[in-house]
Protein backbone atom coordinates (compact mmCIF):
# COMPACT_ATOMS: atom_id res chain seq x y z
CA UNK A 1 0.00 0.00 0.00
CA UNK A 2 1.37 3.42 -0.97
CA UNK A 3 1.44 5.86 1.95
CA UNK A 4 -0.64 9.03 1.38
CA UNK A 5 1.30 12.08 0.23
CA UNK A 6 1.54 15.17 2.48
CA UNK A 7 -1.14 17.80 1.93
CA UNK A 8 -0.20 21.46 1.76
CA UNK A 9 -2.71 24.28 2.34
CA UNK A 10 -1.05 27.63 1.85
CA UNK A 11 2.07 27.67 4.05
CA UNK A 12 0.92 24.69 6.12
CA UNK A 13 1.96 21.09 5.48
CA UNK A 14 -0.41 18.82 7.38
CA UNK A 15 0.93 16.06 9.61
CA UNK A 16 -1.23 13.57 7.72
CA UNK A 17 -4.17 13.49 5.33
CA UNK A 18 -6.90 12.98 7.95
CA UNK A 19 -9.24 15.82 8.90
CA UNK A 20 -11.92 16.20 11.54
CA UNK A 21 -15.07 17.63 9.94
CA UNK A 22 -16.58 20.74 11.49
CA UNK A 23 -19.77 19.82 13.36
CA UNK A 24 -21.96 22.27 15.22
CA UNK A 25 -22.31 21.30 18.86
CA UNK A 26 -19.50 18.76 18.60
CA UNK A 27 -16.15 20.09 17.41
CA UNK A 28 -15.52 22.47 20.27
CA UNK A 29 -11.98 23.08 21.54
CA UNK A 30 -11.84 20.03 23.87
CA UNK A 31 -12.97 17.66 21.11
CA UNK A 32 -10.62 19.16 18.53
CA UNK A 33 -7.66 18.82 20.88
CA UNK A 34 -8.64 15.23 21.62
CA UNK A 35 -8.95 14.28 17.95
CA UNK A 36 -5.61 15.90 17.16
CA UNK A 37 -4.01 13.81 19.90
CA UNK A 38 -5.73 10.76 18.45
CA UNK A 39 -4.26 11.30 14.99
CA UNK A 40 -6.22 13.94 13.07
CA UNK A 41 -3.90 16.12 11.00
CA UNK A 42 -6.28 19.08 10.96
CA UNK A 43 -9.49 19.92 12.82
CA UNK A 44 -12.01 22.63 11.99
CA UNK A 45 -14.04 24.32 14.68
CA UNK A 46 -17.79 24.64 14.88
CA UNK A 47 -19.25 26.95 12.27
CA UNK A 48 -19.43 30.61 13.25
CA UNK A 49 -22.12 32.96 12.07
CA UNK A 50 -20.98 35.63 9.65
CA UNK A 51 -22.78 38.23 11.78
CA UNK A 52 -19.89 39.75 13.72
CA UNK A 53 -22.37 41.64 15.91
CA UNK A 54 -22.91 38.34 17.73
CA UNK A 55 -19.25 37.70 18.42
CA UNK A 56 -19.52 39.17 21.90
CA UNK A 57 -21.79 36.30 23.01
CA UNK A 58 -20.42 33.52 25.15
CA UNK A 59 -21.32 30.96 22.48
CA UNK A 60 -19.30 32.76 19.81
CA UNK A 61 -16.38 33.44 22.14
CA UNK A 62 -16.12 29.76 22.92
CA UNK A 63 -16.18 28.88 19.24
CA UNK A 64 -13.37 31.38 18.62
CA UNK A 65 -11.21 29.92 21.41
CA UNK A 66 -8.09 28.17 20.08
CA UNK A 67 -6.08 28.02 23.31
CA UNK A 68 -3.40 25.33 23.05
CA UNK A 69 -4.43 24.27 19.55
CA UNK A 70 -1.71 23.16 17.14
CA UNK A 71 -1.32 24.78 13.73
CA UNK A 72 -3.13 25.25 11.51
CA UNK A 73 -6.06 26.73 13.42
CA UNK A 74 -9.19 26.50 11.26
CA UNK A 75 -12.34 28.61 11.64
CA UNK A 76 -15.42 27.84 9.59
CA UNK A 77 -17.82 30.68 8.81
CA UNK A 78 -21.40 30.43 7.52
CA UNK A 79 -23.66 32.99 5.92
CA UNK A 80 -25.22 34.19 2.70
CA UNK A 81 -24.10 37.81 2.41
CA UNK A 82 -20.72 38.37 0.69
CA UNK A 83 -19.80 41.49 2.67
CA UNK A 84 -20.75 39.92 6.01
CA UNK A 85 -18.73 36.82 5.14
CA UNK A 86 -15.74 39.00 4.26
CA UNK A 87 -16.06 40.89 7.55
CA UNK A 88 -16.29 37.63 9.49
CA UNK A 89 -13.23 36.24 7.73
CA UNK A 90 -11.20 39.37 8.54
CA UNK A 91 -12.34 39.36 12.15
CA UNK A 92 -11.32 35.73 12.66
CA UNK A 93 -8.01 36.09 10.84
CA UNK A 94 -7.19 39.07 13.05
CA UNK A 95 -8.08 36.93 16.08
CA UNK A 96 -5.62 34.19 15.09
CA UNK A 97 -7.39 31.95 12.59
CA UNK A 98 -4.81 30.52 10.17
CA UNK A 99 -7.29 29.03 7.70
CA UNK A 100 -10.79 30.29 6.95
CA UNK A 101 -13.22 27.60 5.83
CA UNK A 102 -16.48 28.53 4.08
CA UNK A 103 -19.51 26.40 4.91
CA UNK A 104 -21.48 25.33 1.85
CA UNK A 105 -22.01 21.80 3.10
CA UNK A 106 -24.36 21.99 6.08
CA UNK A 107 -27.79 20.57 5.12
CA UNK A 108 -29.61 21.62 8.31
CA UNK A 109 -32.89 23.42 7.67
CA UNK A 110 -32.16 26.21 10.13
CA UNK A 111 -29.00 27.01 8.16
CA UNK A 112 -30.39 26.48 4.66
CA UNK A 113 -33.50 28.52 5.45
CA UNK A 114 -31.18 31.51 5.91
CA UNK A 115 -29.69 30.97 2.44
CA UNK A 116 -26.48 29.63 3.95
CA UNK A 117 -24.72 26.26 4.10
CA UNK A 118 -25.48 23.92 1.23
CA UNK A 119 -28.44 26.12 0.18
CA UNK A 120 -25.88 28.41 -1.45
CA UNK A 121 -25.19 25.80 -4.10
CA UNK A 122 -28.54 26.67 -5.71
CA UNK A 123 -27.21 30.12 -6.61
CA UNK A 124 -23.86 29.90 -8.40
CA UNK A 125 -23.71 33.67 -8.86
CA UNK A 126 -23.95 34.18 -5.11
CA UNK A 127 -21.38 31.43 -4.56
CA UNK A 128 -18.93 33.32 -6.76
CA UNK A 129 -19.57 36.60 -4.94
CA UNK A 130 -19.01 35.02 -1.52
CA UNK A 131 -15.85 33.18 -2.55
CA UNK A 132 -14.35 36.30 -4.12
CA UNK A 133 -15.27 38.47 -1.14
CA UNK A 134 -13.71 36.13 1.41
CA UNK A 135 -10.55 35.33 -0.57
CA UNK A 136 -9.93 39.04 -1.19
CA UNK A 137 -10.59 39.95 2.44
CA UNK A 138 -7.83 37.93 4.12
CA UNK A 139 -4.21 36.95 3.66
CA UNK A 140 -4.65 33.47 5.15
CA UNK A 141 -5.67 30.43 3.05
CA UNK A 142 -9.38 30.00 2.38
CA UNK A 143 -10.94 26.56 1.96
CA UNK A 144 -14.44 25.40 1.07
CA UNK A 145 -16.64 22.59 2.35
CA UNK A 146 -19.46 21.66 0.03
CA UNK A 147 -21.71 18.86 -1.19
CA UNK A 148 -22.02 17.24 -4.59
CA UNK A 149 -24.93 19.52 -5.45
CA UNK A 150 -28.33 20.77 -4.38
CA UNK A 151 -30.31 17.64 -5.30
CA UNK A 152 -29.77 14.53 -7.46
CA UNK A 153 -30.96 16.43 -10.53
CA UNK A 154 -28.61 19.35 -9.89
CA UNK A 155 -25.16 18.02 -9.09
CA UNK A 156 -23.10 21.13 -9.77
CA UNK A 157 -20.14 20.20 -7.59
CA UNK A 158 -17.72 20.18 -10.54
CA UNK A 159 -18.80 23.66 -11.65
CA UNK A 160 -18.40 25.11 -8.17
CA UNK A 161 -15.09 23.32 -7.60
CA UNK A 162 -13.60 24.79 -10.78
CA UNK A 163 -14.96 28.21 -9.89
CA UNK A 164 -13.48 27.96 -6.40
CA UNK A 165 -10.05 26.97 -7.68
CA UNK A 166 -10.01 29.85 -10.18
CA UNK A 167 -10.94 32.35 -7.45
CA UNK A 168 -8.19 31.17 -5.11
CA UNK A 169 -9.72 28.58 -2.80
CA UNK A 170 -6.81 26.40 -1.68
CA UNK A 171 -8.55 23.14 -0.71
CA UNK A 172 -11.98 21.54 -0.94
CA UNK A 173 -13.81 19.11 1.31
CA UNK A 174 -16.65 17.36 -0.49
CA UNK A 175 -19.41 15.45 1.27
CA UNK A 176 -20.63 12.76 -1.08
CA UNK A 177 -24.32 13.62 -0.99
CA UNK A 178 -26.53 16.42 -2.21
CA UNK A 179 -28.27 18.77 0.19
CA UNK A 180 -31.62 17.09 -0.56
CA UNK A 181 -30.19 13.69 0.39
CA UNK A 182 -29.14 14.97 3.83
CA UNK A 183 -27.43 11.83 5.26
CA UNK A 184 -29.65 9.27 3.55
CA UNK A 185 -28.41 6.64 1.13
CA UNK A 186 -24.82 5.87 0.22
CA UNK A 187 -22.19 8.54 -0.34
CA UNK A 188 -21.45 9.30 -4.01
CA UNK A 189 -17.76 8.53 -4.21
CA UNK A 190 -17.86 8.52 -8.00
CA UNK A 191 -19.03 12.15 -7.95
CA UNK A 192 -16.19 13.09 -5.61
CA UNK A 193 -13.80 11.39 -8.04
CA UNK A 194 -15.15 13.50 -10.91
CA UNK A 195 -14.68 16.65 -8.83
CA UNK A 196 -11.14 15.58 -7.93
CA UNK A 197 -10.30 15.05 -11.59
CA UNK A 198 -11.57 18.51 -12.48
CA UNK A 199 -9.22 20.53 -10.23
CA UNK A 200 -5.62 20.56 -9.05
CA UNK A 201 -6.14 21.76 -5.47
CA UNK A 202 -6.29 19.22 -2.60
CA UNK A 203 -9.59 17.38 -2.14
CA UNK A 204 -10.82 15.81 1.10
CA UNK A 205 -13.46 13.10 0.61
CA UNK A 206 -16.17 13.07 3.28
CA UNK A 207 -19.07 10.76 4.03
CA UNK A 208 -19.56 7.32 5.65
CA UNK A 209 -15.89 6.75 6.51
CA UNK A 210 -16.37 4.43 9.47
CA UNK A 211 -13.38 2.08 9.45
CA UNK A 212 -9.79 1.75 8.23
CA UNK A 213 -10.95 -0.53 5.41
CA UNK A 214 -13.57 2.00 4.32
CA UNK A 215 -10.99 4.78 4.46
CA UNK A 216 -8.72 2.91 2.05
CA UNK A 217 -11.66 2.12 -0.22
CA UNK A 218 -12.75 5.77 -0.33
CA UNK A 219 -9.25 6.94 -1.21
CA UNK A 220 -9.07 4.38 -4.00
CA UNK A 221 -12.53 5.14 -5.37
CA UNK A 222 -12.27 8.93 -5.23
CA UNK A 223 -8.58 9.55 -5.83
CA UNK A 224 -8.89 12.19 -3.09
CA UNK A 225 -5.82 13.62 -1.39
CA UNK A 226 -7.28 13.27 2.07
CA UNK A 227 -10.21 12.07 4.14
CA UNK A 228 -12.55 14.03 6.38
CA UNK A 229 -14.30 12.15 9.19
CA UNK A 230 -17.27 13.61 11.03
CA UNK A 231 -20.04 11.64 12.73
CA UNK A 232 -17.97 8.46 12.97
CA UNK A 233 -15.49 10.21 15.26
CA UNK A 234 -18.21 10.84 17.84
CA UNK A 235 -17.45 8.61 20.80
CA UNK A 236 -14.59 7.14 18.79
CA UNK A 237 -11.87 9.77 18.37
CA UNK A 238 -9.26 7.03 17.99
CA UNK A 239 -10.65 6.30 14.52
CA UNK A 240 -7.99 8.68 13.18
CA UNK A 241 -5.25 6.61 14.82
CA UNK A 242 -6.74 3.41 13.42
CA UNK A 243 -7.07 4.79 9.89
CA UNK A 244 -3.60 6.31 9.90
CA UNK A 245 -2.03 3.06 11.08
CA UNK A 246 -3.79 1.05 8.37
CA UNK A 247 -2.95 3.45 5.56
CA UNK A 248 0.74 3.39 6.46
CA UNK A 249 1.22 -0.26 7.45
CA UNK A 250 -1.64 -2.20 5.79
CA UNK A 251 -2.26 -3.79 9.18
CA UNK A 252 -5.11 -3.26 11.61
CA UNK A 253 -4.14 -1.63 14.89
CA UNK A 254 -5.51 -3.24 18.06
CA UNK A 255 -8.74 -1.69 19.26
CA UNK A 256 -8.34 0.42 22.39
CA UNK A 257 -8.89 -1.54 25.55
CA UNK A 258 -11.86 -0.74 27.77
CA UNK A 259 -9.41 0.80 30.21
CA UNK A 260 -8.09 3.14 27.53
CA UNK A 261 -11.60 4.08 26.39
CA UNK A 262 -12.52 4.84 29.99
CA UNK A 263 -9.42 6.98 30.47
CA UNK A 264 -9.96 8.87 27.19
CA UNK A 265 -13.57 9.55 28.10
CA UNK A 266 -12.71 10.62 31.64
CA UNK A 267 -10.11 13.13 30.43
CA UNK A 268 -12.54 14.40 27.78
CA UNK A 269 -15.28 14.96 30.36
CA UNK A 270 -12.94 16.85 32.65
CA UNK A 271 -11.87 19.06 29.76
CA UNK A 272 -15.53 19.77 28.94
CA UNK A 273 -16.31 20.66 32.56
CA UNK A 274 -13.32 23.01 32.66
CA UNK A 275 -14.06 24.61 29.28
CA UNK A 276 -17.77 25.26 29.75
CA UNK A 277 -17.98 25.49 33.51
CA UNK A 278 -19.62 22.80 35.60
CA UNK A 279 -23.30 23.38 34.82
CA UNK A 280 -22.96 23.79 31.05
CA UNK A 281 -20.13 21.25 30.89
CA UNK A 282 -22.29 18.54 32.45
CA UNK A 283 -25.01 19.18 29.87
CA UNK A 284 -22.60 19.14 26.91
CA UNK A 285 -20.85 16.01 28.19
CA UNK A 286 -24.04 13.93 28.22
CA UNK A 287 -24.11 13.37 24.47
CA UNK A 288 -20.42 12.47 24.41
CA UNK A 289 -20.89 9.87 27.16
CA UNK A 290 -23.80 8.47 25.19
CA UNK A 291 -21.55 8.17 22.13
CA UNK A 292 -18.77 6.48 24.12
CA UNK A 293 -21.30 3.93 25.42
CA UNK A 294 -22.92 3.34 22.02
CA UNK A 295 -23.02 -0.34 21.12
CA UNK A 296 -21.67 -1.46 24.49
CA UNK A 297 -23.42 -3.71 26.99
CA UNK A 298 -26.00 -2.03 29.24
CA UNK A 299 -25.43 1.33 27.53
CA UNK A 300 -29.05 2.28 28.26
CA UNK A 301 -28.37 2.03 31.99
CA UNK A 302 -25.48 4.45 31.69
CA UNK A 303 -27.58 6.90 29.70
CA UNK A 304 -30.26 6.89 32.38
CA UNK A 305 -27.75 7.48 35.18
CA UNK A 306 -25.91 10.20 33.28
CA UNK A 307 -29.11 12.08 32.49
CA UNK A 308 -29.86 12.20 36.21
CA UNK A 309 -26.42 13.55 37.15
CA UNK A 310 -26.46 17.30 37.72
CA UNK A 311 -22.88 17.93 38.85
CA UNK A 312 -19.49 17.04 37.43
CA UNK A 313 -18.44 14.75 40.27
CA UNK A 314 -21.58 12.61 40.01
CA UNK A 315 -21.36 12.49 36.22
CA UNK A 316 -17.75 11.33 36.30
CA UNK A 317 -18.58 8.76 38.97
CA UNK A 318 -21.46 7.33 36.90
CA UNK A 319 -19.34 7.11 33.76
CA UNK A 320 -16.41 5.60 35.64
CA UNK A 321 -18.62 3.05 37.37
CA UNK A 322 -20.09 1.92 34.07
CA UNK A 323 -16.76 1.41 32.33
CA UNK A 324 -15.18 -0.10 35.45
CA UNK A 325 -17.95 -2.71 35.44
CA UNK A 326 -17.25 -3.46 31.78
CA UNK A 327 -13.53 -3.78 32.50
CA UNK A 328 -14.22 -6.13 35.40
CA UNK A 329 -16.65 -8.28 33.41
CA UNK A 330 -14.95 -8.46 30.04
CA UNK A 331 -11.43 -8.21 31.43
CA UNK A 332 -12.08 -11.35 33.47
CA UNK A 333 -13.45 -13.13 30.41
CA UNK A 334 -10.35 -12.22 28.41
CA UNK A 335 -8.11 -13.43 31.22
CA UNK A 336 -9.92 -16.77 31.32
CA UNK A 337 -9.72 -17.07 27.53
CA UNK A 338 -5.98 -16.36 27.64
CA UNK A 339 -5.49 -18.92 30.39
CA UNK A 340 -7.44 -21.48 28.39
CA UNK A 341 -5.32 -20.83 25.30
CA UNK A 342 -2.15 -21.14 27.39
CA UNK A 343 -3.40 -24.45 28.82
CA UNK A 344 -4.01 -25.81 25.33
CA UNK A 345 -0.53 -24.78 24.18
CA UNK A 346 1.05 -26.40 27.24
CA UNK A 347 -0.89 -29.60 26.68
CA UNK A 348 0.10 -29.71 23.03
CA UNK A 349 3.75 -29.30 23.95
CA UNK A 350 3.56 -32.08 26.50
CA UNK A 351 1.88 -34.39 24.04
CA UNK A 352 4.44 -33.67 21.34
CA UNK A 353 7.30 -34.38 23.73
CA UNK A 354 5.89 -37.68 24.87
CA UNK A 355 6.79 -40.90 23.07
CA UNK A 356 4.11 -42.91 21.31
CA UNK A 357 3.51 -45.34 24.17
CA UNK A 358 2.49 -42.69 26.72
CA UNK A 359 1.16 -39.85 24.52
CA UNK A 360 -2.47 -40.83 25.15
CA UNK A 361 -1.92 -40.81 28.89
CA UNK A 362 -0.33 -37.39 28.80
CA UNK A 363 -3.17 -35.93 26.75
CA UNK A 364 -5.61 -37.37 29.27
CA UNK A 365 -3.61 -35.77 32.09
CA UNK A 366 -3.86 -32.40 30.36
CA UNK A 367 -7.63 -32.80 30.11
CA UNK A 368 -7.84 -33.45 33.85
CA UNK A 369 -5.61 -30.47 34.68
CA UNK A 370 -7.65 -28.20 32.45
CA UNK A 371 -10.91 -29.33 34.06
CA UNK A 372 -9.51 -28.64 37.53
CA UNK A 373 -8.34 -25.16 36.53
CA UNK A 374 -11.62 -24.16 34.86
CA UNK A 375 -13.67 -21.83 37.13
CA UNK A 376 -17.01 -23.13 38.33
CA UNK A 377 -20.02 -21.76 36.43
Label for each model-derived stretch:
Residues 1-377:
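Flavin-dependent oxidoreductase catalytic cores
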Amino acid sequence: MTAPQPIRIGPYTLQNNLALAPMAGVTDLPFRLLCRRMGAGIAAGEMLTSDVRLYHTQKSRRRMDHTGEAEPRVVQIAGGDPQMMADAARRNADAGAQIIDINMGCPAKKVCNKAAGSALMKDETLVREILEAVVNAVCVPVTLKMRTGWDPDHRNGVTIARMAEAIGIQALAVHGRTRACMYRGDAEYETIRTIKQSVAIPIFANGDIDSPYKAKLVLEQTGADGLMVGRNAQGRPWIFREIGHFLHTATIAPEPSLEEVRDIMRAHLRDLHAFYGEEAGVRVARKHIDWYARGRAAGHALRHAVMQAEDAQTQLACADAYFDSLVETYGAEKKNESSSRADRKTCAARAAAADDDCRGARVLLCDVERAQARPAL
